[in-house]
């Protein structure tokens, strides 16, 4: 279904324990249908979320809010490195289109392709190897088989370790540059979209990398409600 104005949000990392972020995101969800006629959740919405069997109760208000938005405007989720594991039934069961890796949309006459951007943004070789391991179907299957009393502490410990760098400006700059280089190569191909959405680096960006070809990164929602709007024009925004 073609859209006129797509609201893009990513990297809220809900469940990480930051004060007020869940309430801010719920306020964003209430506002979202008035900001555009479609909503794209570009990964790492949750710090960790691995299917309904391992659903933290703290996420219940957000999941209810997402279902309400999806009943009003087309809503799409593409998984991030923190929340693509396991079943996507939590999303599809609430009327949300969900893809683990990549999604294509038509917005204001433009072809938009969205991915989380973690594959393009990993800086260290050790992190790229770790990312490949924890994103594998085997890791998802092992996690799904674990009792919640073991599974939750395990991923919380891994999350704290793997996410310790995400507020480091040096890491962000390097991740953003890797993404930019990957985006430039992708946008230069014959079947390139007009707009490529990548998140993960937490560096908010709207940049025309070549004539008529744009890179959009909405930034990290947990930093004051950052998001982006893709339509006839492309812009960054913040929840006021």
Where do the model's predicted regions map?
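Active-site-proximal beta-strand elements of phosphoester/diester hydrolases
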Residues: 5-13, 111-118, 213-219
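Contiguous hydrophobic, core-forming segments of folded domains
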Residues: 102, 106-113, 121-128
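Binuclear metal-dependent phosphoesterase catalytic core
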Residues: 105-108, 208-240
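Core catalytic region of metal-dependent phosphoesterases/phosphodiesterases
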Residues: 2-7, 14-107
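A short, acidic, amphipathic alpha-helical segment used as a generic capping/interface helix at domain edges
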Residues: 174-192, 196, 201
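Active-site environment of divalent metal-dependent phosphoester hydrolases
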Residues: 15-17, 47-50, 76-89, 119-123, ...
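Structural motif
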Residues: 5-6, 37-38, 110-112, 195, ...
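Active-site-proximal loop/helix segment associated with metal-binding centers of metalloenzymes
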Residues: 117-181
